[in-house]
Amino acid sequence: MQVIKLQILFTPELVHRFFIFFLIISTTSCGVFKKSKKISPRDGVVYYAKTYLGTPYVFGGNTKAGIDCSGLIHNAYRMQGYRVPRTVDELRKKGKRISVDRAKKGDIIFFRTSKKRKLTHAGIVVENKNGIPKFIHASTSKGVIISSIGNSYWER
């Protein structure tokens, strides 16, 4: 009978490799790495629009260097895979009219900011509590901000 003697050498490199292997196995099996949570298209539109907060107003602009209200809407929807028109006038033709108190996150709301009957401004609803929406928009004086419909300026 012949006896074979095996000698295993635990070199520092081998120990290090085993440690890394067991670390990877233990962290993945313990749920340390969580799957990313999917967000709704409405949440995605609002999330992306909020990345423009503080961006200055520039008529016809559509970048972080300067943006107008329809540029903000166009970019936020485009990042979610939607093709929407670039002007307020064209945007208003695409949707259906609902009452302001029914507006949901991600909906587009329109305003007349002059005495003319034409709609000249728009924003994206970020929330609607008790029928009073808050919306993100590009203000000519303050840049991209969040405002409330309850503000007297928007009630006129």
Model-based region annotation:
Residues 42-46, 50, 70-74, 103, ...:
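Extracytoplasmic/secreted envelope proteins and their assembly/folding machinery
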Residues 114-116, 128:
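Short polar/acidic secondary-structure junctions
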Residues 31-37, 41, 82, 96-98, ...:
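Aromatic- and glycine-rich peptidoglycan recognition patches
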Residues 1-28:
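Sec-dependent bacterial lipoprotein signal peptides
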Residues 56-105:
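Catalytic cysteine-centered active-site loop
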Residues 34-59:
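Post-signal peptide N-terminal segment of mature Sec-exported envelope proteins
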Residues 116-122:
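Short, Lys/Arg- and Gly-enriched loop/turn segments at beta-strand edges
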